[in-house]
């Protein structure tokens, strides 16, 4: 797989302590695009130093806005697949080849599943996701998308 076909969108807000390691761990699998959502720390500098493409929001616009900006950048770069993951390091980058493999085989969406215990509201939403759509953890930040 040509890594330039895969964008790894990482929304980040004040994640200077972890973002460099997350970016470094994803470099072999795609183009890390960090969306710094108005951080007041050194998130942008750490992400750039690790080799990420950085999209900078001047103010905190929220998670959805950060994802939208990352998807727009991925489209601008003509990426075929987009993988989203959290900036805090909770997702194991070693799973990325499996996500890419599912996308290459024709999946339009791949959703990760977290190992940690969920809060009550997350548990209820996960139950609804399993019941309605067959998705184990709809709130997990690790997802893979096929661009159409």
Regions found by a protein language model. Name each.
Residues 1-119, 145-148:
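Structured catalytic core of nucleotide-sugar glycosyltransferases
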Residues 119-137:
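A transmembrane-helix-recognition feature enriched in membrane-embedded lipid enzymes
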Residues 127, 140-148:
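Conserved nucleotide-sugar donor-binding
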